[in-house]
């Protein structure tokens, strides 16, 4: 009894250092949270002010210092935007361009990524390096050649001028390649033995396993095409072919700007982007953490 009591009494104080060590390990996380909370608030404030100002009048928005909270709920900006006869057409144009771009990048990007990941052909590495090099070329250097090509094809001032340059991007091909390199080959080899073609293997076996990559490419492509303003501003002249981003610029005149309408239109424009990210958030983050590690 005495010996066991002594052992028990001697072992009891050993738990205290472990607790102190755990607290020391948790302190940095708390410090990070305290640091990230104000930063998150700073990033969220512009979006919050955008929503609040969409319910203000033009006088409230133009006031200095600017109002942080509307005196009353005013739907004048939304009535102005939704009452514009061209607004449904602009919204439909943006949906068409974004949908076609997302679909083509998923299909063509997966085909290109699978070819670079699984097929070895002469010049594949050089072609991959050339494709990746195009990712660092700024748009300002390619917009004039792209415009001339679209003019030669007769697509200027049509939605085709917005769709064709975004049919497939090097980033989509690269992301699919990196993800496919991380998948095991055993299932593909078994399908080949059963007589499946490469296309059947890609779309029936590999593609279902690549849902994170598919979601990531879909979200990023949708964001790029939906929010694009610079290229439609160059390629589109007639208001019937305007996208939503380009149409919102018509609310800004030389001498007067309908700021309430601009804010309301931006809120409507942001909603599809937020919904797309919220629905694909889990698979989007999973793809970012799992791809890019293979070379």
Task: Kindly give the residue locations of the regions a language model identified.
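Short, intrinsically disordered terminal tails adjacent to the first/last structured region
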Residues: 1-20
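A detector for short, charged/polar N-terminal pre-domain segments
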Residues: 18-33
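A structural signal for multi-pass alpha-helical bundles of membrane permease subunits
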Residues: 29-295
